């Protein structure tokens, strides 16, 4: 069984698709048999990844039944499934959490973003109680501007939420440029160098692997 990594939040505009596309491409380029599941009706991540990595498998699943039926089946065929969930805590999002091993929760540095991620953590907790364990929730602080008070408050608040956090991503033009050009930050040359270093370091923290003892998928923080 492959590792199912969900990108979810109760608010849009927090960087779900940016992380999903780059994570899927990074896993693929690291030699993992990878597919993207686009569960967002807007289809932004699937369109972006189709341009950036046309050889990488993509599935569009739009309903809770499709998620619950197809994701476990796909997980038997791939090492890693990256699921880009819809904005909001809909039944589709809840279905995604019922089949994911890991839930990445991007969060921007605003009061609304913090409220949204707290609600997302609550819903992840519901899925954990139903399943008796997974998915593990991990925060991804995003659009950081370290010199600003809101970013400093976000980073301080993250420590109080009871959920582990990755190193975070700064607000960088390279991420917007990659989306607009249908490419990846590591293909932007010098313009994308800082963003590339940051996002690949963030992914390396996940330690995505399969246990040799029982072949169970897992993703742990380093």
Regions found by a protein language model. Give the residues of each.
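P-loop/Walker-type NTP enzyme "switch/lid" segment
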Residues: 4-14, 25-94, 179-185
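Conserved nucleotide-binding/hydrolysis micro-motifs of P-loop NTPases
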Residues: 41-43, 111, 144-147, 174
């Amino acid at each position: 069984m492959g590792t199912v990594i969900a990108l979810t939040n109760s608010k849009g505009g927090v960087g779900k698709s940016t992380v999903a596309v780059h994570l899927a491409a990074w896993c693929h380029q690291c030699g993992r048999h990878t597919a993207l599941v686009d569960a967002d009706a807007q289809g932004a991540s699937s369109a972006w990844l189709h341009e950036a990595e046309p050889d990488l498998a993509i599935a569009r699943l739009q309903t809770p039944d499709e998620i619950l039926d197809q994701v476990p089946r796909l997980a038997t065929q791939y090492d890693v499934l990256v699921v880009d969930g819809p904005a909001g805590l809909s039944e589709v999002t809840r279905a995604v959490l019922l089949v994911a091993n890991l839930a990445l929760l991007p969060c921007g540095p605003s009061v609304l973003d913090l409220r949204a991620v707290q609600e997302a953590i609550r819903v992840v907790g519901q899925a954990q109680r139903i399943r008796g364990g997974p998915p593990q929730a991990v925060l991804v602080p995003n659009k950081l501007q370290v010199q600003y008070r809101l970013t400093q408050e976000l980073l301080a608040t993250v420590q109080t939420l009871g959920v582990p956090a990755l190193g975070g991503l700064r607000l960088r033009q390279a991420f917007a440029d990659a989306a607009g050009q249908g490419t990846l930050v590591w293909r932007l040359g010098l313009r994308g160098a800082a963003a590339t270093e940051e996002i690949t370091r963030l992914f390396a923290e996940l330690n995505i692997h399969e246990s040799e003892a029982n072949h169970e998928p897992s993703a742990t923080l380093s």
